[in-house]
């Protein structure tokens, strides 16, 4: 979300469009990640990472879906998060390369933590917890994940659907903001 703040404070049309797009993407990705955490809790009945491990062995479909959303969280190419952050950085590079450098360090740190978390949940040693192994991913969960994945990749592969709606309104917002500053 730091990229959103950087996109908003520059008063640049490209950055504002990227920030709004990133907010939309963040709503999809964070909602999906919270839904994944709910799915974990439904199966493991624990909330602490130290008790989770070996999820890939017991629930491979659910852990693969979780991987896709974790990669979207770190702005993997092809996802909507990548488009939003890429557009913000395109506009930001004209304003301040120092801010781009600091934000890039933050993105790298976030990616390391995200991948470490996924590795710990999916591939660590299997913990001896009482697990009800009914289904890997039940039908209702699968349909919700399918809808979230559809929008994640739709906006990642065809971002003009949203950007065409944003062009004029972002231009108007920037013009009003510049008048307020003067």
Where are these regions (language model features)?
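Functional transmembrane alpha-helices
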Residues: 1-135
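Cytoplasmic/organellar membrane-interface segments at the starts of transmembrane helices
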Residues: 59, 115-182
């Amino acid at each position: 979300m730091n990229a959103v703040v950087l996109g908003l404070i520059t008063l640049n049309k490209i950055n504002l469009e990227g920030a709004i797009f990133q907010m939309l993407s963040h709503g999809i990705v964070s909602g999906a990640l919270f839904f994944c955490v709910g799915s974990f809790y439904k199966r493991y009945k624990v909330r602490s990472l130290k008790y989770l491990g070996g999820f890939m062995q017991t629930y491979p479909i659910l852990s693969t879906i979780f991987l896709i959303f974790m990669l979207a969280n770190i702005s993997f190419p092809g996802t909507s998060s990548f488009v939003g952050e890429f557009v913000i950085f395109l506009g930001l590079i004209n304003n301040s390369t120092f801010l781009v450098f600091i934000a890039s360090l933050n993105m790298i740190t976030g990616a390391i933590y995200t991948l470490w978390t996924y590795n710990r949940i999916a591939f660590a040693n299997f913990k001896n917890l009482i697990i009800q192994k009914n289904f890997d991913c039940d039908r209702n969960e699968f349909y919700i994940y399918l809808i979230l994945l559809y929008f994640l990749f739709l906006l990642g592969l065809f971002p003009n659907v949203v950007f065409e709606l944003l062009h004029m309104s972002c231009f108007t917002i920037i013009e009003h903001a510049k008048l307020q500053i003067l």
